[in-house]
Amino acid sequence: MKMATPETLKKEILSASLDERLKKAYVTEENVKEQYDRYINLLNEFEALFGKNRDVRLFSAPGRTEVGGNHTDHNHGRVLAAGINLDAIAAASKNDENIVRVKSEGYSMDVVDATDLSVNPNEMGHSPALVRGVLAGFKKYGYKIGGFDATTASRVIAGSGLSSSAAYEVLVGTMVNYLYNDGKVDAVTIAKIAQYAENEYFGKPCGLMDQMACSVGGVVTIDFNDPKNPVIEEVD
Protein backbone atom coordinates (compact mmCIF):
# COMPACT_ATOMS: atom_id res chain seq x y z
CA MET A 1 0.00 0.00 0.00
CA LYS A 2 1.08 3.59 -0.52
CA MET A 3 3.01 5.55 2.09
CA ALA A 4 1.10 8.10 4.19
CA THR A 5 0.78 9.34 7.75
CA PRO A 6 -1.06 7.06 10.18
CA GLU A 7 -3.95 9.55 10.38
CA THR A 8 -4.32 9.63 6.59
CA LEU A 9 -4.30 5.84 6.38
CA LYS A 10 -6.93 5.58 9.11
CA LYS A 11 -9.21 7.96 7.20
CA GLU A 12 -8.72 5.97 4.00
CA ILE A 13 -9.56 2.72 5.77
CA LEU A 14 -12.73 4.12 7.33
CA SER A 15 -13.83 5.70 4.04
CA ALA A 16 -13.55 2.28 2.33
CA SER A 17 -11.11 3.66 -0.26
CA LEU A 18 -8.69 0.81 0.45
CA ASP A 19 -11.31 -1.93 0.22
CA GLU A 20 -10.30 -3.16 -3.23
CA ARG A 21 -6.72 -3.66 -2.09
CA LEU A 22 -7.85 -5.33 1.11
CA LYS A 23 -10.05 -7.73 -0.87
CA LYS A 24 -6.91 -9.20 -2.41
CA ALA A 25 -6.00 -10.49 1.05
CA TYR A 26 -9.40 -11.05 2.65
CA VAL A 27 -11.54 -11.98 -0.40
CA THR A 28 -15.03 -10.91 0.68
CA GLU A 29 -16.47 -7.52 1.56
CA GLU A 30 -17.60 -8.88 4.93
CA ASN A 31 -14.07 -10.03 5.75
CA VAL A 32 -12.67 -6.65 4.70
CA LYS A 33 -15.01 -4.75 7.05
CA GLU A 34 -13.88 -6.99 9.91
CA GLN A 35 -10.30 -5.85 9.35
CA TYR A 36 -10.96 -2.14 9.86
CA ASP A 37 -10.54 -2.16 13.65
CA ARG A 38 -7.46 -4.32 13.35
CA TYR A 39 -5.64 -1.90 11.09
CA ILE A 40 -6.86 1.17 13.00
CA ASN A 41 -5.55 -0.31 16.26
CA LEU A 42 -2.25 -1.12 14.58
CA LEU A 43 -1.87 2.48 13.38
CA ASN A 44 -2.90 3.88 16.78
CA GLU A 45 -0.20 1.77 18.40
CA PHE A 46 2.34 3.01 15.85
CA GLU A 47 1.43 6.64 16.57
CA ALA A 48 1.72 6.10 20.32
CA LEU A 49 5.15 4.49 20.06
CA PHE A 50 6.80 6.22 17.13
CA GLY A 51 4.94 9.47 16.45
CA LYS A 52 2.14 10.82 14.27
CA ASN A 53 4.13 12.54 11.52
CA ARG A 54 5.83 9.49 10.04
CA ASP A 55 5.41 8.17 6.51
CA VAL A 56 3.96 4.71 7.10
CA ARG A 57 3.14 1.71 4.92
CA LEU A 58 0.84 -1.20 5.73
CA PHE A 59 1.88 -4.80 5.10
CA SER A 60 0.36 -8.28 5.32
CA ALA A 61 1.71 -11.83 5.15
CA PRO A 62 -0.63 -14.84 5.32
CA GLY A 63 -0.39 -18.04 7.27
CA ARG A 64 -0.47 -21.22 5.22
CA THR A 65 -2.20 -24.56 5.08
CA GLU A 66 -0.63 -27.69 3.63
CA VAL A 67 -3.09 -29.47 1.40
CA GLY A 68 -0.71 -32.31 0.55
CA GLY A 69 2.95 -33.15 0.87
CA ASN A 70 3.79 -32.71 4.56
CA HIS A 71 7.59 -32.97 5.01
CA THR A 72 8.15 -33.73 1.34
CA ASP A 73 9.72 -30.30 0.79
CA HIS A 74 12.97 -31.23 2.54
CA ASN A 75 12.87 -34.66 0.87
CA HIS A 76 12.95 -33.09 -2.61
CA GLY A 77 9.31 -33.93 -3.27
CA ARG A 78 6.20 -32.04 -4.28
CA VAL A 79 3.70 -30.16 -2.14
CA LEU A 80 0.31 -28.56 -2.55
CA ALA A 81 -0.10 -25.59 -0.23
CA ALA A 82 -2.14 -22.42 0.13
CA GLY A 83 -1.96 -19.04 1.77
CA ILE A 84 -4.95 -18.34 4.02
CA ASN A 85 -6.81 -15.20 5.08
CA LEU A 86 -5.51 -15.40 8.65
CA ASP A 87 -2.48 -13.15 8.45
CA ALA A 88 0.19 -11.12 10.19
CA ILE A 89 -0.02 -7.37 9.53
CA ALA A 90 2.35 -4.47 10.10
CA ALA A 91 2.57 -0.70 9.99
CA ALA A 92 6.15 0.35 9.30
CA SER A 93 8.27 3.40 8.58
CA LYS A 94 11.95 3.84 7.72
CA ASN A 95 14.30 5.52 10.16
CA ASP A 96 17.84 6.81 9.66
CA GLU A 97 19.34 5.13 12.73
CA ASN A 98 20.12 1.64 11.33
CA ILE A 99 18.03 0.30 14.20
CA VAL A 100 15.00 -1.94 13.71
CA ARG A 101 12.28 -1.69 16.35
CA VAL A 102 9.34 -4.07 16.10
CA LYS A 103 6.52 -4.02 18.62
CA SER A 104 4.27 -7.03 18.16
CA GLU A 105 0.87 -7.17 19.83
CA GLY A 106 1.16 -9.00 23.16
CA TYR A 107 4.96 -8.96 23.21
CA SER A 108 7.73 -6.62 24.29
CA MET A 109 9.52 -4.55 21.66
CA ASP A 110 12.33 -6.19 19.69
CA VAL A 111 15.30 -3.95 18.97
CA VAL A 112 17.90 -5.09 16.42
CA ASP A 113 21.01 -3.25 15.21
CA ALA A 114 21.02 -3.52 11.41
CA THR A 115 24.80 -3.05 11.36
CA ASP A 116 25.36 -6.18 13.48
CA LEU A 117 24.29 -9.19 11.43
CA SER A 118 26.23 -11.89 13.26
CA VAL A 119 24.32 -14.83 14.72
CA ASN A 120 23.48 -14.18 18.38
CA PRO A 121 23.17 -17.48 20.30
CA ASN A 122 21.13 -15.74 23.00
CA GLU A 123 18.45 -14.84 20.45
CA MET A 124 17.93 -18.34 19.08
CA GLY A 125 14.31 -19.42 19.36
CA HIS A 126 13.15 -15.82 19.77
CA SER A 127 11.77 -13.24 17.35
CA PRO A 128 14.80 -10.88 17.30
CA ALA A 129 16.73 -13.72 15.67
CA LEU A 130 14.22 -13.78 12.82
CA VAL A 131 14.51 -10.02 12.29
CA ARG A 132 18.31 -10.15 12.33
CA GLY A 133 18.32 -13.22 10.08
CA VAL A 134 16.06 -11.60 7.50
CA LEU A 135 18.29 -8.51 7.43
CA ALA A 136 21.34 -10.74 7.02
CA GLY A 137 19.60 -12.67 4.24
CA PHE A 138 18.85 -9.52 2.28
CA LYS A 139 22.47 -8.44 2.69
CA LYS A 140 23.67 -11.88 1.60
CA TYR A 141 21.61 -11.65 -1.59
CA GLY A 142 23.02 -8.19 -2.33
CA TYR A 143 19.98 -6.11 -1.41
CA LYS A 144 19.71 -2.94 0.68
CA ILE A 145 18.82 -2.94 4.35
CA GLY A 146 18.38 -0.29 7.02
CA GLY A 147 16.50 0.73 10.11
CA PHE A 148 12.74 0.92 10.51
CA ASP A 149 10.06 1.12 13.18
CA ALA A 150 7.04 -1.18 13.05
CA THR A 151 4.01 -2.40 14.94
CA THR A 152 2.61 -5.82 14.11
CA ALA A 153 -0.40 -7.97 14.97
CA SER A 154 -1.06 -11.56 13.96
CA ARG A 155 -4.00 -13.93 13.66
CA VAL A 156 -1.63 -16.75 12.72
CA ILE A 157 -1.51 -18.25 16.19
CA ALA A 158 1.73 -19.85 17.37
CA GLY A 159 1.39 -23.64 17.54
CA SER A 160 -1.71 -23.68 15.34
CA GLY A 161 0.03 -25.47 12.46
CA LEU A 162 -0.44 -22.45 10.19
CA SER A 163 3.23 -21.42 10.16
CA SER A 164 3.26 -18.38 12.42
CA SER A 165 7.04 -18.07 12.25
CA ALA A 166 7.10 -18.25 8.45
CA ALA A 167 4.35 -15.61 8.23
CA TYR A 168 6.36 -13.34 10.54
CA GLU A 169 9.59 -13.87 8.58
CA VAL A 170 7.85 -13.11 5.30
CA LEU A 171 6.21 -10.05 6.87
CA VAL A 172 9.60 -8.69 7.96
CA GLY A 173 11.05 -9.54 4.55
CA THR A 174 8.22 -7.73 2.79
CA MET A 175 8.83 -4.64 4.92
CA VAL A 176 12.54 -4.62 4.03
CA ASN A 177 11.65 -5.23 0.39
CA TYR A 178 9.36 -2.21 0.07
CA LEU A 179 11.04 0.16 2.52
CA TYR A 180 14.54 -0.31 1.11
CA ASN A 181 14.32 -2.11 -2.25
CA ASP A 182 11.30 -0.57 -3.98
CA GLY A 183 9.50 -3.92 -3.95
CA LYS A 184 11.95 -5.40 -6.46
CA VAL A 185 12.70 -8.60 -4.53
CA ASP A 186 10.52 -11.46 -5.82
CA ALA A 187 8.40 -13.70 -3.59
CA VAL A 188 10.61 -16.76 -4.09
CA THR A 189 13.72 -14.88 -2.94
CA ILE A 190 11.88 -13.52 0.10
CA ALA A 191 10.89 -17.10 0.97
CA LYS A 192 14.51 -18.26 0.68
CA ILE A 193 15.66 -15.38 2.89
CA ALA A 194 12.97 -16.28 5.44
CA GLN A 195 14.11 -19.91 5.48
CA TYR A 196 17.72 -18.77 5.92
CA ALA A 197 16.68 -16.67 8.92
CA GLU A 198 14.86 -19.59 10.53
CA ASN A 199 17.62 -22.12 9.86
CA GLU A 200 20.70 -20.07 10.67
CA TYR A 201 19.55 -17.43 13.16
CA PHE A 202 16.46 -18.88 14.87
CA GLY A 203 18.09 -22.32 15.04
CA LYS A 204 15.24 -24.38 13.60
CA PRO A 205 15.87 -26.74 10.67
CA CYS A 206 13.00 -26.51 8.19
CA GLY A 207 12.22 -26.99 4.54
CA LEU A 208 11.00 -24.21 2.27
CA MET A 209 7.31 -25.05 1.93
CA ASP A 210 6.04 -22.84 4.76
CA GLN A 211 7.92 -19.74 3.70
CA MET A 212 7.13 -20.29 0.03
CA ALA A 213 3.39 -20.68 0.63
CA CYS A 214 3.30 -17.58 2.85
CA SER A 215 5.34 -15.50 0.41
CA VAL A 216 3.76 -16.55 -2.90
CA GLY A 217 0.18 -16.78 -1.57
CA GLY A 218 -2.83 -18.36 -3.25
CA VAL A 219 -2.96 -22.09 -3.95
CA VAL A 220 0.30 -23.41 -5.38
CA THR A 221 2.10 -26.62 -6.22
CA ILE A 222 5.81 -26.57 -5.50
CA ASP A 223 8.29 -29.11 -6.85
CA PHE A 224 11.41 -29.30 -4.67
CA ASN A 225 13.35 -31.72 -6.87
CA ASP A 226 15.99 -28.97 -7.02
CA PRO A 227 15.55 -27.40 -3.57
CA LYS A 228 17.57 -24.31 -4.50
CA ASN A 229 15.34 -23.64 -7.50
CA PRO A 230 11.84 -24.94 -6.72
CA VAL A 231 9.27 -24.96 -9.52
CA ILE A 232 6.08 -23.14 -8.53
CA GLU A 233 2.74 -23.32 -10.32
CA GLU A 234 -0.46 -21.55 -9.36
CA VAL A 235 -3.59 -23.68 -9.05
CA ASP A 236 -6.87 -22.09 -10.15
Language-model-detected regions and their locations in the chain:
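Redox-cofactor-proximal catalytic regions of oxidoreductases
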Residues: 70
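ATP-dependent small-molecule kinase catalytic core of the GHMP/sugar-kinase superfamily
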Residues: 2, 75, 178-236
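Conserved hydrophobic/aromatic beta-strand scaffold that supports enzyme active sites
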Residues: 81, 89-91, 219-221
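Anion-binding (especially nucleotide phosphate/pyrophosphate-binding) glycine-rich loop
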Residues: 2-58, 86-193
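Short Gly/Ser/Thr- and Asp/Glu-enriched loop/turn motifs at secondary-structure junctions
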Residues: 60-62
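Short Gly/aromatic-enriched secondary-structure transition segments
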Residues: 76-83
